[in-house]
Amino acid sequence: SEKPQQELEECQNVCRMKRWSTEMVHRCEKKCEEKFERQQR
């Protein structure tokens, strides 16, 4: 079975690859976390 944690890390990696400000990347990572938290319920 696919591990949500791995998908979360991939999502966050995409955020980091973008040439955004640190704040924007952080916001993007947070959205990933929120998305995967909802999926697990």
UniProtKB/Swiss-Prot annotation:
Q: Which domain of life is it from?
A: Eukaryota
Keywords, ordered alphabetically: Disulfide bond, Protease inhibitor, Serine protease inhibitor
Which GO molecular-function terms appear in the entry? serine-type endopeptidase inhibitor activity
Single Gene Ontology BP annotation: negative regulation of peptidase activity
On whether Flavoprotein is a keyword of this UniProt record, the answer is no
Known role: Inhibits bovine trypsin with a Ki of 0.174 nM and trypsin-like proteases from G.mellonella larvae. Has no activity against serine proteases chymotrypsin, subtilisin and elastase. Has no activity against cysteine proteases from beetle gut.
Q: What is this protein called?
A: Trypsin inhibitor 2c
The organism is Fagopyrum esculentum
